Amino acid sequence: MKKARIFILLLLPAVVLTAGCGGGKARVGKPLPAWSEGCLDIHAVNTARGECTFLILPDGTTLTVDAGEFSSEPKKYRSMPQKPDSLTRPTRTYARYMRHFMPYKDSLDYFLLTHFHMDHLGQLEPEYGRSAGGDYVLSGVTALYDELPFREIVDRAYPAYDSLACLAMSTASLANYRRFIGRATEHNGLKAAMLRLGDSGQFPLRRRPERYPDFRITGICSNGCVWDGEKVVNHYGDGTLRENGASCGILLSYGDFDYFTAGDAGGNTRVEYPCARSIGRPVEAMKSHHHLSPHTMQDDMLAVLQPDVIVTQSFYIRDIQPDQGIIRRISESKILGAKRMYFTNIDRSLTDADPQLYARSAGIGGHIVIRVSPGGKEYCVYMLDDSDTTYTVKQADGPFRCKPQPQNTEKHE
């Protein structure tokens, strides 16, 4: 067994120097080729100062999920070094990255805010400027809109913020966001809506939808409620719902490819397993819940979703985020699914202290890109250099075949 493993490792560099999944063959040491028609791109954009995922859908429609931003060091724990440098604000990095890859440069089509925590919404910092009218501070979501406007925004509460958005950790950040929503919807033409659970039509393709009838995005969870395939079920009732458990979650499906993302709705909430049951079949990829914090990514959920790729956006120097015990459990699990774990950041002090543990990961450090080939039959995973704006490929994995959809199971509606 050991000899076989050594043989595989010796062959590995030759295998991963190039990988092609549409948009041209990607080569290690060269910039990632541009998106091309029919491909689906999922980019975990790394600034080490918040979570942000940028998607280019098969016809060029764009969707951004979250745009976290903070600059001050939390008192509880240290942050990773900011990327690409300490002088460039995270939202500027997000906008620059998106403009580089998006095929239509004028504006983003959709923005989904999963919940109202600073690492997804934006923290109010003394040095951040204000909007042109002075109505609100430019931070996270609001600053990204100032840099690169989006046409529609979806969150978990609009317009019922008084009744549904009372759980946020930072009332100041939420109040700032509400002022932004009021101003932008009234004066700038921004459309706003609450995520509709069970609805596969809230994020339609904008340019050539007729070419991609097997593409859809479905609302799965929000406000502690989960779509069970027939109805919306409240999994908290009169119990205490906290902000993480209120996160929005969506399932993106394209051909045989499925991707699930749900903010911080992890195992320390009541919705992780119900979301998996709602989806009811293996997925190719997912964002880890709550930065792979303790109690997330439980075995009952993994047994249903059986992910082949797990992407974690993390930015603190902590052995519990991502949690070492969960990395170990997932890597040793006999549950089906390749469970290749990719991390935007893990500090060198942690990897040096336990190199055997972190050697189980598929990739550490950088922007993480999942590129799905036209038709949704196969995909590749790329790690990109996050130290500059050339977006050089550091690692190329795949192509991987998607799991065929069971003949007796229809796509989630």
Residue ranges and their predicted role:
Residues L17-G20:
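C-terminal motif of bacterial Sec signal peptides marking the signal peptidase cleavage site
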Residues K25-D41, T47-A48, Y104-K105, Y110, ...:
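Flexible, acidic/histidine-containing loops and adjacent segments that form or flank the divalent-metal
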